Amino acid sequence: HTQTDSINTKILYRIEQTDSNNITNSDAIYNRPFIGVQKTRTAIGGYVEGNTNYFSEDGIIEGFSMELRRFNLFIYSSISRRIKFLSELEFEHGTKEIALETAQIDFTLNTAFNLRGGVILPQIGIFNANHDSPNWEFIDRPLSSTNIIPSTLSEVGFGVYGKLLKDNSIISYNLYISNGIGDGIVLNENARTSIPAGKSLEMFEEDNNGIPMLNGRISYALRSKGEVGISYYGGTYNS
């Protein structure tokens, strides 16, 4: 009891996950290094990614190069017992690119069924929802998560999500509708279908054709052993 009182008197304190055995890949946006602020319902967090590379291509050596690739800030707030807010702001390559990657409100009803809306992360594959650099033991993101699925892909939309907890396993699901990407997915300089080329700033303002895209993912996880899932992302993209 004395130790608990000591922790509560700190202005800033580390927030620990209390149900780590029930965390799946779709929970990664909340399973982050947050610092709580005393007597508030708000927490802040973030990470910095910097690296150095030695470039050599086709016998041509460019030598060493250093880069501050990402500087990300998180803000979390428990507005009420059932309503929580999360945002992520990313500064990439110094300040060359600034993006609001997440700004969502969750209405938590119970473990099996909840509502989510705002700037969300579509559940495509495993990496888009769990893209924070400190979570991975490699410097560059996988090609499948950059050239095929443009992590990080953010969209304006809303939907439902939840988990079914079993003795030794977890079944989780996400189902969203969103503005979706534009016709740049096929009308691009790459002369091929490219989801990254379909991204645009307009997708945060309005749907280019008035027909929402559909995204869904379902996964099965064995506690502390692994997770397998299948996802869908599709709809009408041309205007």
What are these regions (language model features)?
Residues 27-28, 56-58, 139-144, 196-202, ...:
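Extracytoplasmic loops and strand-loop junctions of Gram-negative outer membrane beta-barrel proteins
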Residues 179-239:
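Surface-exposed beta-loop-beta
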Residues 1-49:
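N-terminal periplasmic/intermembrane-space "pro-region" immediately following the signal or transit peptide
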Residues 34-55, 62-183, 210-215, 219-227:
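Outer membrane beta-barrel
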